[in-house]
Amino acid sequence: MTESCTVFSFSGPKGIPDYFPPDSAQFVAVRDGLLTAARRAGYGDIELPVFEDTALFARGVGESTDVVAKEMYTFADRGDRSVTLRPEGTAGVVRAVIEHGLDRGALPVKLCYAGPFFRYERPQAGRCRQLQQVGVEAIGVDDPALDAEVITIADAGFRSLGLDGFQLEITSLGDGTCRPQYRKLLQEFLLQLDLDEDTRRRAELNPLRVLDDKRPQVQAMTAAAPVLLDHLSDGAKQHFDTVLAHLDALRVPYVINPRMVRGLDYYTKTTFEFVHPGLGAQSGIGGGGRYDGLMRQLGGQDLSGIGFGLGVDRTLLALHAEGKTVGETTRCDVFGVSLGEAAKLKVAMLAGQLRAAGVRVDLIYGDRGIRGAMRAAGRSGARIALIVDDCAIKADGVGVRDLATGEQISVAVDSVVAEVISRIAPS
């Protein structure tokens, strides 16, 4: 009797990429470069759950937004509680600030974070269902200088990676004084248009969301809609003008985009987006803005805040569009080749010493001859190969070969670490 064997074949979830060498090195370099810019400005790291109470996002992000209405991964846990994989970072940070009383200490609370976020979107280049972001949040101070600092951090993060073809677009979405009047004006304009039923419902519920509609036919109909920048209160206008003055002084270039509407309901006053022409129609690589009512809306003090989220995946695509790469392209600096059992132990000991000194070392495994071992060394991308055989151990010698030139010398075992470090140290 022959037993049948089931063969399994698994693929990753649709719209979610795997990152592995060498591409993963570039991904890590982009993420860390963007985070470093925030840390240098005094922002501390915060780690948050990847899922939260669904009501947090419904209330914080806005029930009429596409994010909440169409894009969230929501499910019931085993306690029959509705939870959602986080679609963005700000609501979770604000929840943590309120829950742990961080807003009761020194202000502003300055936090940064990185990690995966989840949106059920149509998969396409740079639009993944698991998107990787770096974000910052500054909570507790309503100061246009802080807005400028947050924007400057993002600008500096991109430039630190060598990215220079991006553009900062900025506007103001007003405050509680002018928004209600503008909302009424916009609603009157929209309801006279020949809108489909769903769009008309959004116009009645939250007219700003209609301006965020990406369908060409809707954009054409709303092209003549009133612009919020023309209806700012004196306070909102002064705030926006001061932000621009700071950006001018800091030499951060920008373009005012009066028709920008971000996809999240909590934005007020300063709102911005970084775009890159190399990404086509889906050109955004990051954005953010001020959210002065969100703390109160989520049950906290009436404190202001500002932040951003920058797409790691999309920044990497923008770099590639400019023909640039970042990060280490090789996995190791040194490749250890052992010929014989005693040699294998000696190479492992040397590798441990070099790794402790901060040198990246990979080793040959399995029984290979010298030719196969050296081919593996060449493919590793290492600059140096350590070659040890059982005979060399008796003579207290280790072969140190420059893999670029092929030059090889014999070095005493006790001198190998110093010799290697001297060779790979920056000149």
Swiss-Prot record:
Gene Ontology terms: biological process: histidyl-tRNA aminoacylation
Organism of provenance: Mycobacterium leprae (strain TN)
EC number: 6.1.1.21
Annotated family: Belongs to the class-II aminoacyl-tRNA synthetase family.
UniProt name for this protein: Histidine--tRNA ligase
Alphabetized SUPFAM superfamilies for the sequence: Class II aaRS ABD-related (SSF52954), Class II aaRS and biotin synthetases (SSF55681)
Broad class of the protein's primary localization: cytoplasm
Coiled coil: none
Catalytic activity: tRNA(His) + L-histidine + ATP = L-histidyl-tRNA(His) + AMP + diphosphate + H(+)
EC top class named in words: ligase
Signal peptide (residue range): none
InterPro entries tied to this protein: aa-tRNA-synth_II, aa-tRNA-synth_II/BPL/LPL, Anticodon-bd, Anticodon-bd_dom_sf, His-tRNA-ligase, HisRS-like_core, HisRS/HisZ, HisRS_anticodon
Keywords recorded for this protein, A-Z: Aminoacyl-tRNA synthetase, ATP-binding, Cytoplasm, Ligase, Nucleotide-binding, Protein biosynthesis
Top-level taxon of the source organism: Bacteria
MF-aspect GO terms: ATP binding; histidine-tRNA ligase activity
GO cellular component terms given for this protein: cytoplasm
Keyword field contains Transcription regulation: no
Localization per record: Cytoplasm
Subunit structure: Homodimer.
